[in-house]
UniProtKB/Swiss-Prot annotation:
This is Transcription factor vrtR2. InterPro entries: Sec_Metabolite_Reg, Transcription_factor_dom_fun, Zn2-C6_fun-type_DNA-bd_sf, Zn2Cys6_DnaBD. GO terms for cellular component: nucleus. Keywords: DNA-binding, Metal-binding, Nucleus, Transcription, Transcription regulation, Zinc. Pfam families: Fungal_trans, Zn_clus. It comes from Penicillium aethiopicum. The lineage of its organism: Eukaryota, Fungi, Dikarya, Ascomycota, Pezizomycotina.
Length: 836
């Protein structure tokens, strides 16, 4: 019996399968088990795992079996998680029970790299290795993880989730230590760049899994790499500076519509307001994130789904180029910054701006706004030559950076006028109708509400106080001039928003008028931060002349359209005469041939005055009960005054667009909607065939510019009253123009003699507005002006009237508004050619 037992034991041992030398290979050869079908799993029934199973057969539904390895459960699942976090020697000494669990993914040495990083953190080796070596280790690890995780299968992805969470946590610990060590080893405000370093996380789907993209700074520039998403919000880190055009190629690689998942930003604790000049009357810059909230996202400014660019490196060279464009194209028109101070900081490379470091969030917001505004004024050819990128791509990036910078500057809680200056620049930037800007893109209440926000913030900071009150509080001349310029620019865009939405302005006529006399007609080089006494105004053309023209006209525009003091035609005519006298006094010594800015100021001012004279006869009406402005008086039959004044405005706008001296300012010139609609309506009812024949080519050109802009922007032309009125007038005038010999079919010309004859007779007893204006007529130019307007200007038939990058400014024509001389809703401030 013992021998039988021994023999049986020997047979049992011989029947046992031999232990495989490679357990992993044996597990791989094992067939994939069949699990409960989909219906039984959802209904929580026991499945017999037939094909089809009995439950599905009895229910009469299709059976969908599931074939995959079983997921570890209970203590086995905990064992897999523990194995991923234990040291390598512990993993190699795994127990026999662990061998029965699901096999861990082959990390290809990933655990070794994790352990190395963990040891660096624990032993504080970062201070010994230096920032460069630590960054290289981090870059190597990220590249390894990216290579290892890309071909992950559905099963390995589940197991890798545990590893990725642990890895993400340790990388964040490592980066925090690197950041802390950098602050300890490097003096304040003089840190050395980290090379390379993670810049920003981005969410993006990849291979059915939830992965993230991140922008990594490498010696070759910014690169987008894949990495598993961290479980918590990631703090953006500052990155080294770039120069040249390296940033553009990498910024546009990612999808602009990937939804962001991590928006929290960690601000460096040492970004505080340094000493020096508090140029904005600020009481100190607090942490905008801790004291406020993400105001812009709530207000709809950051309404795109693109990720944040706030942590991307500062491109000094690109910023310098765009600042030069701003100083040339924008600063002469929107005069809210001190030109020499801005040039020293962004062009010459000064470390501070008016005593504030370039790391200050308010200064960053101003830089982003300057670049965004400047990029808008460039043509497509200029963008390609300077940055090798399209204008739309540059504008998309610059707009996003501007919005994020304003958000992080704490717009709603700021006490710094620099942030408000940046916000105003953001609001006045016009861009393509169908693409990216705020003012021209959003024709609803969005910009209208944001303008109201800007006005409230300015009032909350006391920037609207009268100059006498500021003097009593010890306000310097420098502070006063910048404050008044900002306030009057806000008054300007407030008037524009009122026209756009057919509402009353928020700023009263008195609040706007009291500040105008205190703005000096001087150059920015005449004063600086240390100027102790006021500087007297000049008689000649200065940096502020054109801005003063717009300030004075917008004050008159409030009286014309919203004030109760101009209810009669005589009062309105008197006000128009006063405005003309004030404006042309500023241009008394302006030589249009001296510079492009002088040429533009001269002709643009005349265009503004023509719009004022037209608005004298056609006041703006909100269409609300109790409006201040009465309907226009009935006109005599055959009166062509409206048509004359509308044509003067249209012709002057065409002249500015056609002459090469207006290239840098074309972003500012828009289609005068009031003049265009009035001219079309008057031609439809005018009986003077000769006048209509001379006027119609100008009307066709102006209307075609608007139409071509809509086509170039790939947006449908709104079929509103203006379109119907234009088609109706064309049909009516077609036989009349042919009989009158207008030659419209042969060329789109306007004879200069005819153009000169488009001046209505001067009323008897009229007082000349300015000695430079021949015979006292506002429409007649001097010999000097005439030479500037036609000396180098080819005839109309040789001009290409295609509107290049100049957007049409004006709210869309709304249903129910008839564009006639009796009832017209201008929707824009045609006093200023609508450039707010």
């Amino acid at each position: 019996m013992p021998s039988l037992s021994s023999k049986t034991s020997t047979m049992q041992r011989s029947c046992r399968p031999q232990m495989s030398a490679c357990p992993n290979q044996q597990q791989k050869d094992r067939p994939v088990p069949q699990l409960s079908c989909v219906l039984c799993r959802d209904r929580k029934l026991k499945c017999d795992k037939l094909d089809p199973c009995s439950n599905c057969t009895s229910s009469g539904v299709a059976c969908t079996p599931i074939y995959r390895p079983r997921l570890p459960r209970g203590r086995h699942a905990r064992t897999v998680q523990t194995k991923a976090s234990t040291p390598p020697d512990t993993r190699r000494r795994g127990s026999s029970n662990e061998s029965t669990t699901a096999p861990a993914p082959d990390d290809g040495g990933l655990g070794t790299h994790i352990d190395q990083l963990d040891n660096l953190v624990q032993d504080r080796e970062v201070s010994k290795l230096g920032l460069s070596g630590e960054g290289n280790g981090l870059q190597e690890l990220i590249s390894l993880v990216s290579d290892e995780t890309m071909p992950a299968t559905a099963w390995s992805t589940h197991c890798f989730g545990t590893i990725s969470r642990i890895l993400s946590s340790r990388i964040r610990r490592l980066e925090s230590l690197v950041q802390e060590t950098a602050r300890i080893q490097t003096p304040k405000r003089a840190r050395k760049p980290m090379t390379p370093v993670v810049v920003q996380w981005y969410s993006a789907p990849l291979a059915g899994c939830n992965w993230n993209r991140m922008v990594v700074q490498t010696p070759q520039g910014l690169e987008v790499q894949q990495f598993p998403a961290p479980p918590t919000s990631y703090s953006a880190r500052r990155s080294p500076e770039l120069s040249g055009n390296d940033i553009w190629a990498d910024l546009m690689d990612h999808d602009m519509h990937d939804p962001p998942q991590y928006n929290a930003l960690e601000l460096p604790p040492d970004l505080t307001n340094e000493g020096g000049v508090d140029n904005m009357g600020s009481s100190g810059r607090d942490d905008p994130i801790n004291n406020g909230f993400n105001a812009l996202r709530l207000l709809g400014i950051n309404n795109s789904l693109s990720p944040s660019f706030i942590s991307l490196p500062r491109d000094r060279l690109s910023a310098s180029k765009l600042c030069q464009v701003y100083l040339q194209n924008v600063d002469p028109i929107i005069k809210i910054l001190h030109r020499p101070s801005l040039s020293r900081w962004m062009v010459d490379g000064a470390p501070t701006y008016l005593g504030s470091s370039e790391d200050d969030y308010a200064v960053k917001a101003l830089e982003s706004a300057v670049c965004y505004t400047a990029a808008n004024t460039m043509t497509e050819h200029q963008c390609q030559a300077a940055f090798q990128k399209t204008k739309s791509s540059i504008m998309a990036v610059r707009r996003k950076m501007c919005e994020d910078a304003l958000e992080n500057a704490g717009l709603l809680t700021t006490r710094d006028m620099t942030v408000l200056q940046a916000f105003i620049l953001y609001l006045v930037t016009p861009t393509d109708l169908s693409k990216i800007g705020r003012r021209s893109e959003d024709k609803d209440t969005a910009v209208w509400a944001l303008v109201a926000l800007a006005i409230r913030l300015i009032k909350a900071m006391g920037l609207n106080q009268e100059p006498s009150e500021g003097a009593r509080k010890g306000e310097s001349f420098f502070q006063q001039q910048l404050r008044l310029r900002l306030w009057l620019t806000a008054c300007l865009i407030d008037l524009q928003a009122s026209f756009a939405q057919a509402t009353d302005p928020l700023i009263t006529h008195r609040d706007a008028a009291c500040a105008v006399p205190y703005v000096a007609n001087i150059n920015d080089s005449d004063f600086d931060v240390d100027t102790a006494h006021p500087v007297a105004s000049h008689e000649e053309l200065t940096d502020t002349t054109f801005a003063l023209v717009t300030y004075r006209v917008q004050v008159a525009g409030r009286l014309f359209n919203f004030g109760p003091g101009c209810s009669t035609a005589a009062e309105r005519h008197k006000l128009a005469q006063e405005v003309q006298q004030q404006v042309f006094t500023l241009l008394h010594y302006c030589d249009p041939e001296s510079s492009s800015y002088a040429w533009f100021t001269w002709h643009s001012t005349q265009s503004i005055i023509f719009a004022v004279r037209l608005s004298e006869l056609l006041p703006f009406r909100c269409g609300q009960p109790g409006g201040h402005v009465p309907p226009p008086s009935p006109r005599a039959e055959g009166d062509t005054t409206l048509l004359w004044r509308a044509l003067q405005n249209l012709e002057k706008a065409q002249l500015i667009r056609a002459d090469p001296r207006g290239d840098g300012f074309r972003w500012y010139i828009t289609t005068p909607w009031l003049a265009l609609s009035t001219a079309i309506s008057e031609c439809n009812s005018c009986t003077d065939v000769a006048l209509v024949c001379r006027a119609w080519p100008v009307i066709e050109i102006s209307y075609r510019q608007h139409e071509e802009l809509q086509i170039s922007d790939e947006c449908q032309l709104p079929q509103g009253p203006l379109v119907h009125l234009m088609n109706k007038t064309r049909e009516k005038l077609a036989p009349l123009l042919q009989e009158g010999g207008a030659r419209l079919s042969d060329s789109q010309t306007v004879d200069r003699a005819s153009a000169d004859s488009l001046q209505p007779p001067v009323p008897v007893g009229s007082i000349p507005i300015d000695p430079l204006l021949t015979n006292g007529s506002l429409g007649a130019d001097t010999a000097m002006s005439e030479a500037s307007s036609i000396g180098s200007l080819p005839p109309f038939e040789q001009q290409c009237w295609k509107q290049m990058t100049m957007p049409t400014d004006g709210a869309p024509v709304r249903d129910g508004v008839v564009f006639t001389s009796e009832l017209y809703n201008p929707l824009q401030s045609d006093f200023l050619n609508s450039h707010g």
